[in-house]
Amino acid sequence: MPAPHRLYPRSLICLAQALLAWALLAWAPAQASQELTLVGKAAVPDVEIALDGDDWRWLARKRVLTLGVYAPDIPPFDVTYDERYEGLTADYMAIIAHNLGVQAKVLRYPTREQAVGALESGQIDLIGTVNGIEGRLQSLRLSVPYAADHPVLVMPIGARRAPPADLAGQRLAVDANYLPRETLQQAYPQATLHYFPSSEQALAAVAYGQADVFIGDALTTSHLVSQSYFNDVRVVAPAQIVTGGESFGVRADNTRLLRVVNAVLEAIPASERRSLIYRWGLGSSISLDFARPAYSAREQQWMANHPVVKVAVLNLFAPFTLFRTDEQFGGISAAVLQLLQLRTGLDFQIIGVDTVEELIAKLRSGEADMAGALFVNAARESVLSFSRPYVRNGMVIVTRQDPAAPADADHLDGRTIAMVRNSAAIPLLQQRYPQAKVVTADNPTEAMLLVADGQADAVVQTQISASYYVNRYFAGKLRIASALDLPPAEIALATARGQTELISILNKALYSISNDELASIVSRWRGSDGDPRTWYAYRNEIYLLIGLGLLSALLFLSWIVYLRRQIRQRKRAERALNDQLEFMRVLIDGTPNPIYVRDKEGRMLLCNDAYLDTFGVTADAVLGKTIPEANVVGDPALAREMHEFLLTRMSAEREPRFEDRDVTLHGRTRHVYQWTVPYGDSLGELKGIIGGWIDITERAELLRELHDAKESADAANRAKTTFLATMSHEIRTPMNAIIGMLELALLRPADQEPDRQSIQVAYDSARSLLELIGDILDIAKIEAGKFDLAPVRTALRALPEGAIRVFDGLARQKGIELVLKTDIVGVDDVLIDPLRMKQVLSNLVGNAIKFTTEGQVVLTVTARPDGEAAHVQFSVSDTGCGISEADQRQLFKPFSQVGGSAEAGPAPGTGLGLSISRRLVELMGGTLVMRSAPGVGTTVSVDLRLTMVEKSAQATPPAAAAQATPSKPQVSLRVLVVDDHKPNLMLLRQQLDYLGQRVVAADSGEAALALWHEHAFDVVITDCNMPGINGYELARRIRAAEAAPGYGRTRCILFGFTASAQMDEAQRCRAAGMDDCLFKPIGVDALRQRLNEAAARAALPTPPSPQAAAPATHDATPAAFSAESILALTQNDEALIRQLLEELIRTNRADVDQLQKLHQQADWPKVSDMAHRLAGGARVVDAKAMIDTALALEKKAQGQAGPSPEIDGMVRTLAAQSAALETQLRAWLEQRPHQGQP
């Protein structure tokens, strides 16, 4: 045994430690508590209680009873907001304090344990909402129960079966402050317990599939279900636990307090208890008491001065505020405002706004008096005054129905969360999930759309709003994943600061509305129109009901049939004739085609309405009469013929007969399908004939139209075949000359002088081939309806003069006199497309010269004013061989030709010129007429009605403007050239250098744009198809920069440069902001002409012509590989030739390698782009086979989606053609003399 002197100090130390722990335990709750204002029932009842004098004296000294409550709230027992405490427990506490004559004080603690500790330390007198089990575990003395506590089990509405009695295998969700673990494990040992911070979160876990069963007291469960989960869960069974009801708890030694509290509770009548239950929405019905509260004199005066209150609401805040399709205001807030109107007499005028910011601005500016629904938060309370909340609702997480979406709140960190702008929950979310990204939207609908569209991973909303939107608008796309551990959102009315009377009026009116009424309003607006799970949950019952319904219907029908049979048996003799007549009437008159019945003499016995309608007669006109007697066909001879036919039919045949006939009725021929059936009696004796017909005139016409359409389609197919054969002939003819002459030129020794005549033949053939392609494109545009004229002011006299100048040399070569005669009076300038008019005149004059061997060709122009327009006639007459009438009818069809004479043989050309000319003239609103006779000559006249334009000194035809340009100062232009294909870039730069231009080159759109911003350029020529910034985008950016304010340069001329032959390529260039489009390849002369025209349009200095004479060049030389084309493009500059071809060979190698890699990767869009690039390079040397293959590959790859053997072959062919082209080019270079670089 230890010594006494040693035990004494140790005892002191233990005692000191115990006192310190007790002090800390008592101090901690005091520091953590928060004082609340008790808000009980407005009308507190007086009850008779029996207390002795000592108890009353004790209460007089006591003066204050302190009630302890704790977080989280247990609605409807404990409800805290804005430092106020209300609920069922608050109501009873108010009754106790009132009847005991003491003041009630409420302290709120963060946890139940701290509240119990404060009770044990004497800081509070009693604690509320304690059931019997909790009281025994915490050694408390409990008052008599003031509310029943019946634990119930809750499951999702979609659950098909009730849970097993022992909840075996079930996930049981429970409030951590409700029942202790030992009690639950004893009642349900095989269930898996899941504790949650509050009953609301535990119930949400069941609603959203995170738990199977919820257990809670009946009152709290009923309140939460009606407020938030009406369409999600349901009570399925009572729990196997007895708690003893909800009571007040006091310290075990405070018997006096327990006695006086029990005295009050026992004295409260049952009617008052029911009233309190109904007040919190827990009764069986909703109160209809709309009596107005007692308003103060100031409040009544305010309502008298403001009979109309303007209420601002959000347009999209469903289900709280919304506007229906008929513009009617609806939602929870609308229903609350209706109740407030009954309790205040105020008239609420609704003002819809789009955002919360706009709503608050209207409140602060006075445009609105109050807000109909707004979330309560601290930030808004600094500028607004809020009423008592009429909806309190938990926050939930809404995600997509996607396995990758966040499953619950624990998976939100690092995700993108959508929130309504300025939501009070944003700071809390950012604090809890620091790695999450918050994006904001103006309203809940937009926030939901962000998640549905994949721009956010989750949205945080109140459970009511989330359920409303998901069920109505995002079913199958979004889902409510779980509840969020955040303070419940509070929806309240709000006013601007200073509206003291209004906010007081609203609060009083809201307090007069029972929570039962508010719960009913919320229930009407939650959930969707129909739960999609209902069918699957109750399909067996529905099938059973349908089966029972069908069985009942079948029994009912059987009974009806039985009764009708009895009736028919009794009245058969009476109704037999009526039934027969009714049957005949329905059978005959119900048929839409004519039907008749005649006796064996041909008299009409019966006919239907369709028969009478066909002939336009009544039944009296035909019944009992033969066809000649009634004469309904209008032709006596035809009537007799038809009558004889029927008699013969009845006497000769007894079998049904069906046939097609053409009949004429009242002058109209109809094609009918007629049938006749002789009929007899039961003995087989002939009684007459039944007949009718079906009018198949429309069907016959459709068949004829179908036949005609087939003939037309066959003719079109034959025309297509003819076109292809003609095109093959027309293309092969010049190609034969081109290839043959070039082959002979290649076979000549390298040192031998080239045969100029052979080259001239090839050149002429190429020009004819180019004209053929141009004509075909014109025909295609006209037939597609995409051919547009460009009428401009034009000097009328300049049109024929230009045509005469063009063909003067050709006429002299043939020894033909070409004469221009003009008879123009009072007409100067007209509005016309000069290019297309010159095309027409050129075709007509060219044809006249072509078919005239001697004599003359006369172009006559006659013009006279006709009002504001001018009547103009162009006439081309020749002394040629003439054309017969038959040939003239064929001549204006495409590809139609006639020979000029037997000696001349077949005429050269494609036969498209006259066809195009006539169509162009018709597009201009004129006519083209030919008059000719064999041996006399031909005259072709074009008659037009053109708008006259007032003569202007500045009016100059385009051709004259181009010719007048050289008179301007000879100053070179600053030209920016852009092309990612180095051979094309080098060639175009050399051509521009040759023309004396100042050239800056760029090999990409990005580099070109940078150069353009740094330097001023007069002209920009850009390739249309480039990686990165292509030509179209470059043009758009340049034009946008020029249009910007403060841009100080002159607008530059912008040309597109492309190898594409699409008809709409020029239109695409102009749409992008370009002035025009150049097509590869382009010769020096053509390039000079386009620059001259551009300089004239933009009033730029005209580019000078080169000092050294250069050979004529052409835009294209259609041959497989043309040395002449290379010489023309480079102006026979040996150094440039070698530089160009070496760069082309190197670039083609790289492009082919890249093409093969892209082909292996099946990157079809890039394969198409690379094929277009190779086609552009091949055009430099007119490698036609390679161009054709590249263009075919480009087109095929554009729409390709998978592997293609055809593309595989094209890629191999293109690689082989590139290698062959390289071999041929190097061989050609070896044959040429070597020169040094210039």
Swiss-Prot record:
The PTM 4-aspartylphosphate maps to D1023
The compartments listed are: Cell inner membrane
Q: Domain PAS spans what residues?
A: 580-651
A biological process (GO) of this protein is: regulation of DNA-templated transcription
* Keywords on record: ATP-binding, Cell inner membrane, Cell membrane, Kinase, Membrane, Nucleotide-binding, Phosphoprotein, Signal, Transferase, Transmembrane, Transmembrane helix, Two-component regulatory system, Virulence
Periplasmic topological domain: 332-541
Give the UniProt entry's GO cellular component terms.
Answer: plasma membrane
In what residue span(s) does the Response regulatory domain sit?
Answer: 974-1095
- What Gene Ontology molecular function terms does this protein carry? ATP binding; histidine phosphotransfer kinase activity; phosphorelay sensor kinase activity
Which parts of the sequence carry Phosphohistidine?
Answer: H729, H1172
Q: Where are the transmembrane segments?
A: 308-331, 542-563
- Annotated Histidine kinase domain residues: 726-948
What is its membrane topology? Multi-pass membrane protein
PTM characteristics: Activation requires a sequential transfer of a phosphate group from a His in the primary transmitter domain, to an Asp in the receiver domain and to a His in the secondary transmitter domain.
Q: Which residues form the signal peptide?
A: 1-30
| Enzyme Commission (EC) number | 2.7.13.3
Please give the CDD domains that the UniProt record associates with this protein.
HATPase_EvgS-ArcB-TorS-like, HisKA, HPT, PAS, PBP2_BvgS_D1, PBP2_BvgS_D2, REC_hyHK_CKI1_RcsC-like
Task: Give the reaction(s) catalysed.
Answer: ATP + protein L-histidine = ADP + protein N-phospho-L-histidine
Stretches assigned to the Cytoplasmic side: 33-307, 564-1238
Ranges of residues in domain PAC? 652-708
Q: Which InterPro entries match?
A: BvgS-like_periplasmic1 (IPR049870), BvgS-like_periplasmic2 (IPR049871), CheY-like_superfamily (IPR011006), HATPase_C_sf (IPR036890), His_kinase_dom (IPR005467), HisK_dim/P_dom (IPR003661), HisK_dim/P_sf (IPR036097), HPT_dom_sf (IPR036641)
Q: Which coarse location class describes where this protein primarily resides?
A: membrane
The protein in question is named Virulence sensor protein BvgS
